[in-house]
Amino acid sequence: MSEEKAAKTTQNVAEGDTEPSAAQGGQASADNASAHQVHVAGDKEALAKAARAAMKKSHGKVILVPVDFSPHSEAALVFAAQLAESISASLIVLHVVHDPGEMPGYYSRLVKKKRVDLIANIAKEVFDEFMKDAIGKNRDHKAIRKAQKLMVTGLPVTRILQVAEKVEPMMLVMGSQGRTGLKHLFLGSKAEQVVQLCPLPVTIVKHKK
């Protein structure tokens, strides 16, 4: 997969990107949710920069928290914050901007870029609101206020694994809907794929209804 040369707030998905499967083995105030935000599409330099910023604050201990703005993600973020504060670690909160209609080669590069740019702009606003809301509900958790925000364009599981490889966190914390039965076995969730494919410890948090 080719890599972009610079981190930009508007970048398109790398062509030929496919989701892996288990078989393949594939300083903010309480009112400021934008402690630090980087938006990249797999750029090593930008990911390394985000990792260094987080590690500088936590002496190398970082917890990566992928979120999709669901109640399950919020529960995972709160759990991760509690854990981070108990061990003097910091958080990198990751959101992967995914275009559901993305098909390699289907659109021209220009059309794809415009479409993903629009989705990325909307995602940034939702990301900001998600973090602002989480901060407002959990004012006692400094880890949430000081979290590094990282927004990456691509396919969720692929990008989560790539970011984990670059950032090298001590662990990942993710939310899950907790499906059971045949639907659970045949479909599988993104959280389950990350658990199976990521070499790092992954904790799954379920939202209490």
What are these regions (language model features)?
Residues M171-Q196:
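Glycine-rich, Arg-bearing micro-motifs that act as flexible, cationic patches
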Residues E3-Q11, A22-A23, N32, A53-K113:
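Small/aliphatic-rich secondary-structure junction motif
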Residues M1-S58, K132-L172, K209:
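Structural beta-alpha unit
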Residues E85, E165-K166, Q196:
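Solvent-exposed polar/charged
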Residues V111-V126:
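A short acidic, glycine-rich active-site loop
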Residues S108-K112, K166, K190-A191:
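Short, hinge-like loop/turn segments at secondary-structure boundaries
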Residues L200-K209:
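Short, flexible loop segments at boundaries between secondary-structure elements
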